[in-house]
Every structure is written in structure tokens, then in C-alpha cells.
Design a protein with these regions (language model features):
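Individual transmembrane alpha-helix segments
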Residues: 1-13
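Short hydrophobic alpha-helical segments that form membrane-spanning helices or hydrophobic packing faces
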Residues: 13-14, 176
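Membrane-interface helix-loop-helix modules in multi-pass membrane proteins
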Residues: 15-19
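Contiguous transmembrane helix-bundle modules in multi-pass membrane proteins
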Residues: 23, 29-189
Length: 189
């Protein structure tokens, strides 16, 4: 669960990579490196044999936090890029292309879930239910971005929506995956 950032931070991080500037490069390199270290077993095994302090002991679960961190920082750069594009009214094409690709991704996943049924029914029900909210968040934000092409003053509403949608999505994910003890067990009276 340490790698979860939400659908809009991922969108904004990709946007930051598309509009990449020199100051974003260290976070792109950190994100790619952390992802490779966390998901490439031969590389983890090799680093473990080197007996380097911290690096040899770092398990994939700890390294993935660096990926989440870099994705979050890139999302903040992407948000700046989005606001700049919407205020200056140029480079709409990159945002439209990225939104279109994300829309194709969402439609593809829904088609796979409904028609190909790649998993047992009990898992399929959970997968569909878990994909509803990210789809709604994405469509809502995309609608506001498209609306901002016509109404410039809606940018503040977009910022508020992205903040609330990401916060709610993170809270929902946390409550779902992190165990919490009942209050009476933690604070006995």
C-alpha cells in the first residue's frame, strides 16, 4: 500500500514528465530507479550481495516509498504545468492527448472487466467495485479541465477538486488497507 498515490497524482506526474524541465529530472531518475530496485529481483539480489549499509538491507517495500515520493513531487510539478497551460491558454494539445490516453485506459479496463472476465467472479466483483471511484474522479476532473478551456476562472475549482478527490481517495485507500484497532483496545478506560 506504500505505493498508492491516486489517479490524479499519477495523471499530473505524467504531465510533469511530458513538460519535463531540468528541475524535474532528479525526481524522474529517482522514480525510475526506485521502481527498478523494487521490482527487479536480480538487481535486488545483486545489491544484497554487495553488503552496502542501508542499500543491502533495504527491501522492496522500503524502496517503493522513494517511488511514491518522486511521483508525488512530480505531481506537484505537473499541477504547476496544468495551471500554467490553463492560464496562458497554450499547449492544450498535450493535455488533451494525455486525457485521451487515460480515457482509453479506463475504457479498456472496463471492457476487459465486463467482457473478457480475466479472473474468478468473486474477484471480478471486487475489481469492478474498486474501479468505480477512480473512474468517477478521473471523469469529474477531466470535465472541469475541459470546462476551463471555456471559462478561465474555474481553475480554482479545479485545484479544489483535485485536492479533495486525491485526499478522499487516499483516505479511502488507507481505511481499506491499513488495520485500525478499536478505540477501546488502544485506550482502555
Amino acid at each position: 500500500w506504500a505505493s498508492f498515490v491516486g489517479i490524479w497524482p499519477v495523471f499530473l506526474a505524467i504531465l510533469a514528465i511530458i513538460f519535463a524541465r531540468r528541475k524535474q529530472l532528479p525526481f524522474i531518475v529517482l522514480g525510475v530507479s526506485a521502481l527498478l530496485l523494487a521490482t527487479c529481483p536480480p538487481l535486488i539480489t545483486f545489491l544484497g550481495t554487495l553488503k552496502l549499509p542501508i542499500i543491502s538491507n533495504a527491501v522492496a517495500g522500503r524502496i517503493i516509498i522513494l517511488f511514491s515520493f518522486s511521483l508525488t513531487v512530480l505531481a506537484s510539478f505537473g499541477f504547476d504545468d496544468l495551471v500554467e497551460v490553463l492560464e496562458k491558454r497554450k499547449n492544450f494539445k498535450k493535455i488533451i492527448i494525455l486525457s485521451g490516453l487515460m480515457l482509453i485506459f479506463f475504457v479498456s479496463v472496463w471492457l476487459i472487466l465486463f467482457f473478457l472476465k480475466p479472473m474468478p467472479t468473486q474477484w471480478l466483483i471486487v475489481a469492478k467495485r474498486n474501479f468505480i471511484l477512480p473512474t468517477v474522479f478521473f471523469l469529474g476532473g477531466t470535465f472541469l479541465i475541459v470546462l476551463s478551456f471555456k471559462f478561465k476562472k474555474i481553475i480554482i475549482l479545479i485545484a479544489l477538486y483535485l485536492l479533495l478527490a486525491t485526499s478522499f481517495d487516499s483516505l479511502r485507500f488507507t481505511r481499506k488497507w491499513m488495520p485500525f484497532d478499536p478505540r477501546n483496545l488502544v485506550y482502555p478506560e
